[in-house]
Amino acid sequence: MSQNTTSEHTDVAREPEDLSRLFLCRVNAGDVDGLVALYESDAVLATPDGGEVRGEAGIRAFYAALVASAPRFAPGEQHPALRVGDLALTSTRLPGGAGATAEVARQQPDGTWRWILDRPNVL
């Protein structure tokens, strides 16, 4: 699978729950730019090895390496977002009991949502 780094991202998260669907589509398509667009520029992403990456460059490098291995992600069971003001906690139970995700999203001035904190597997 080749990395798509030039696609346009007309599909945006109008609700915080949209982020999970957009992630799944973009990671399975190998769309690195699309994945980076799901995050604020100073977001923090936890990595499977217990580390973290920060900011657009770090998140881009992480996803470039991930999609290079051509993974296939299946949809999980998404829980309704918990919201307060312009923040939302999103979470998805991963298929097959493989854990769960936890993310914090922030509503942008244009009404769309982007993740600011992402822990892909909390269990």
Model-derived features: positions:
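A beta-strand edge to alpha-helix "cap/lid" segment located at domain peripheries
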Residues: 2-34, 44-123
